[in-house]
Design a protein with these regions (language model features):
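A shared catalytic/ligand-binding motif for oxyanion handling
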Residues: 1-113
């Protein structure tokens, strides 16, 4: 299974959406995680449709925050387990075997202590 993670740095530019669509067409990922999307949920639903995905989960940006999104194909059995402004955590169950695996998309800066 292929998953695509992309730091968008904003999807306001139509060219950015076009490049993302080219990546999706080329690699045919079953799951896509986007960070720094800079779009509201309505805008991200449009992007999801342009990328030919059926399912999506969105973490709305707060103020000048960036926001997150995860899209997955119709045939993928994905359940969101938890989320925050920095991550989306999910479990995928494979239909044929019942095998479960975790996928977590996250965005943030490295903190040193």
């Amino acid at each position: 299974m292929i998953a695509l993670c992309w730091n968008c740095r904003g999807l306001g530019n139509p060219r950015s959406v076009g490049v993302l669509r080219e990546c999706v067409q080329r690699w045919d990922p079953k799951v896509v995680f986007l960070s720094e999307k800079k779009k509201n949920i309505t805008g991200m639903k449009r992007v999801k449709v342009k990328l030919d995905f059926v399912n999506g989960f969105y973490v709305q940006r707060k103020g000048k925050g960036w926001g997150l999104a995860m899209f997955w194909r119709k045939e993928i059995n994905l359940e969101i387990k938890s989320y925050s402004k920095h991550r989306i955590d999910a479990v995928i169950t494979e239909e044929a075997t019942g095998f479960k695996w975790r996928i977590t998309g996250f965005y943030g800066h490295l903190e040193t202590h």
